Amino acid sequence: MMARRDPTSWAKRLVRAQTLQKQRRAPVGPRAPPPDEEDPRLKCKNCGAFGHTARSTRCPMKCWKAALVPATLGKKEGKENLKPWKPRVEANPGPLNKDKGEKEERPRQQDPQRKALLHMFSGKPPEKPLPNGKGSTEPSDYLRVASGPMPVHTTSKRPRVDPVLADGSATEMSDRGSVLASLSPLRKASLSSSSSLGPKERQTGAAADIPQPAVRHQGREPLLVVKPTHSSPEGGCREVPQAASKTHGLLQAARPQAQDKRPAVTSQPCPPAATHSLGLGSNLSFGPGAKRPAQAPIQACLNFPKKPRLGPFQIPESAIQGGELGAPENLQPPPAATELGPSTSPQMGRRTPAQVPSVERQPPHSRPCLPTAQACTMSHHSAASHDGAQPLRVLFRRLENGRWSSSLLAAPSFHSPEKPGAFLAQSPHVSEKSEAPCVRVPPSVLYEDLQVSSSSEDSDSDLE
């Protein structure tokens, strides 16, 4: 019977038994806790409690019978402040609080003793305390100390001004101080002498006491000479306005550059002042030199001439503004000169061709005129015959440096404008010296030369 048993079958049975035992065993990983135990790492999604999951039978959402009402815990009386806003009153203050109170009372008792000692040595009555309780330090307090150098006491408070004088005198003193700061020492002395007058006398006599400089400037637009008030005649008009006698006039006199851009205009009822103020170098009259109308300076200041139209052989406007040319050759005189007739003045009749005022608004020193330069006169009589008015003659002078200078020559009234010979014979202003070396230059060469000079000046002005 024993021989019939196969050892291989016995081995197979052992392997089967071992595999069945392995399958019955739990997995090798972490074991899950039994349902009765709680795991704080788990959280239920239904009730939000820790210790179980949503599938557990301990969840109160699934088993309502097992849900318990949370019981309130007992009160802890020692940690809660039932009356937080009630101040604590200490019936018996400690020894530390007593020491603090004594230290605060000691300086209060020493203050009246110090004031009494200071009153005895200085002899001054005791000071009354201010309503805000802050004491004020006076400069005399520093003088009471006998030893040591006297310190410098500076206060940042402004001096009080009397309310009666605060309205008028304070503003006048501030204005007077600002004016004195911008004037020279000589003007300060004259202004201090005029300040002793009354307010009304100061307004009328400021122009007479303070030496006002003449308003004759050497800028691009020379102004008429304005005389002080005391030099004008009694019957004539007053050229200086009333505002010039006040402090505003002094500030304008201190800034002469701001007045160059505003030409002064004389009124009509002042003919002697207007004739006296016009000098040889003025640029205000646009009419002929020997035939200046009576209202020429007023028209020159108020109504400036319009931009003339350019002909085929005339000078462009850019060359006129460059400073080397005078005016176009076909400029017509104002209509007042032809209608009112000639009115010759003694100063204007004595002028030479070099002194005749030009139309360009430039000072006379900016254009050098050499006596050795050759001169040439040109005029277009065809345009004058069509217009029916008197043309203006332009005298061109070629300088040594290759530039040109021009000046206006007034032509007298002639009956036959078609004849150029009669025009040259009747003009009294052309001197023999200028006609003798006269060389006729074609207009094209003259126009090209003027364009070159104007372009060179424009480039120089751009570089500056």
Curated annotation (Swiss-Prot):
InterPro entries: FAM90, Znf-CCHC_6. Residues 1-42, 70-389, 411-437 are annotated as: Disordered. It holds the Pfam family zf-CCHC_6. It comes from the Eukaryota. Residues 180-197 have a biased composition (Low complexity). Residues 74-89, 97-114 have a biased composition (Basic and acidic residues). Belongs to the FAM90 family. Primate-specific FAM90A gene family, thought to have arisen during multiple duplication and rearrangement events. This is Protein FAM90A3.
